[in-house]
Amino acid sequence: MKSRYPLISAEEAASFIPHGSTVTFSGFGAAASAKAVPKALAARARELHGRGEPFKLRVLTGASTDENLDEEMARAQAISWRAPYQSSPTLRKQINSQEVEYVDMHLSHVPQAVIFGFFGKIDFAVIEATEITPDGRVYLTTSIGASPTFLQHAQKVIIEINHSQSPRLREMADILVLPPPPHRNPIPIHHPLTKIGWPYAVVDPLKVMGIVETNEPDHVPGFSPPDEVSQRIAHHVVRFLLDEVSAGRIPKEFLPLQSGVGNVANAVMASLGEHPDVPPFQMYSEVYQDALVDLMMDGRLLGASAASLNLSPSCMDKVISNMDFFASKIVLRPQELSNHPGIIRRLGVIAMNTALEADIYGNVNSTHVCGQHIMNGVGGSGEFTRNSYLSIFMCPSISKGGRISHIVPMCPHVDNNEHSVQILVTEQGLADLRGLGPAQRAQRIIERCAHPAYKDYLLRYLQEAPLGHIRHDLSRCFELHRNLLEHGSMLPDLKLE
């Protein structure tokens, strides 16, 4: 039977999109990131730029993307504005050189911002799917993200049907687009595996310009084996959580976990799964990543809610080959639900995220090196940290051979402040900050988390700062960062083996 939607090439699809358009793309991490059309847009940008014609787009996604989108389009100088999150080296350089305007924002806010026009008109949506039906049901692939909202609010839609993605992924999907306030009812999610929606998103068929066929898997790199620092951080986190269970502050059946991405997060999850005293647990998180696959198959992870399956090829193959097992244990949701403050608070989620640096009072910088240069973005860390039952931040105490301390007197940029950060962990130890005033917090962080080579400096800073509820010396609070910029080391005379 003939499809009601025309088959078009990626190049044809790209030709429909004019300079200056606002284009939304599927993807939450590399999972379900649009693949063919972004590459064609990059090629079109190079061609037009070669003729002296302008071609730049405003790009909005659910989170970061794979290299086919942000990296490829940035190399082609095809992006003028970007939100809400990125992890592309080339795009990062363009943002930090003010070539690209970047809106770093909480991920659960994206759908509502689209609905109410905070970003202006959405001209196009390019969405990966396994199927679109004649009546406009769109079956998404390895992430849900903000795609359901993009489909509803874009003026025109292009669907990438990816034949490499399993049609059975729809069995994990639970899609609901919230109505606008003040007409929202309580969201009846009382367990990480509760389903309240449908396995498909919806689009007006009249908006669909065509289908681009692809056959390309997600490009998710595998994580490196955890190093000694990551393992020591993981040990401290596991020991703390077990002590909380013993003290009756975490129930014996445990609480749902949220974990950020990266090697430290993977090390923590692996350590939790391996420890015989940790009961089998659930997750309510943004991303389902590699470390969780074996934990689930071993019966250590009972169920997981996420916005995406951000899995390396080998782990994705394992999931798809065992869909009868995994389909009932993983729920994929839109990011306004996976990161919803009310659900996080109701379930009592334990949030575990990584920091670039933390100051002696527990303020966390997650995004900007020396307060100036963006790395990736705040992502969902703020939503989980502010609303979790326990908020934990992790980072190494030093890096670059000791030239950088990740515990500093004052963070030059703050994403998650002292009011939300309860636990701080480095390989040196764990600082429980609950119930402590600023002076006590500072003493504990320096004592438990700072590297020995920096402890004397931090203690001296604290003792010499003028008195106040929060002691700071505004003439010296960024001395370590200035030293780093001017001398390449926070303590230029420090020599570490």
Can you annotate each of these PLM segments?
Residues 1-497:
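Conserved alpha/beta enzyme-core scaffold
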